[in-house]
Amino acid sequence: MGYAFGSIDELGEGFGFRKVRRALGITAFGVNAVVYPPGHDGFKHYHDTQDELYFVHSGRALVEVGDEVRELGPGGMVHVESTTPRKVSNPGDEPLVMLVVGGKDGYVERDGHMVDPADVERRAAFGKVAN
């Protein structure tokens, strides 16, 4: 099929990662919808190969990248090169909904690494909505 429609709501409920790429059959790049609860402290991480684009759909995102910390609202976005550590948190009192797109020359496999080993368990417990 040459196209596919979907919505975040169709990909699951609650907080966590929603696999847009799988649901829509995308193979050229990685893409997830991410829903963070109010006050969620993000996960500082980097990638071997994938750059990422974070797009804020709703809520507020506190983005720590390099030496900079910036708050983004709906419509805000940031591009982060693969090996640059980044952390996205939700400083607000409403859920944060983001679209995260990653890729490098068509590479879509998982290649992320947590900076703080304690975040490995926290990330695993955070939840993944299966699709």
Located regions from the model:
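A short, N-terminal "cap"/entry segment at the start of jelly-roll beta-barrel domains
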Residues: 1-28, 43, 109-131
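Conserved short histidine dyad/triad with adjacent acidic residue
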Residues: 17, 32-47
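Short histidine-centered beta-strand/loop micro-motifs
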Residues: 22, 42-48, 89-91
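Ligand-binding loop in jelly-roll beta-barrel domains
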Residues: 25, 62, 82-108
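Short strand-coil-strand connectors
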Residues: 27, 64-68
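Glycine- and acidic-residue-biased ligand/ion/polar-headgroup-sensing regions
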Residues: 49-51, 55-61
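Short acidic-glycine-tyrosine-enriched beta hairpin
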Residues: 67-83
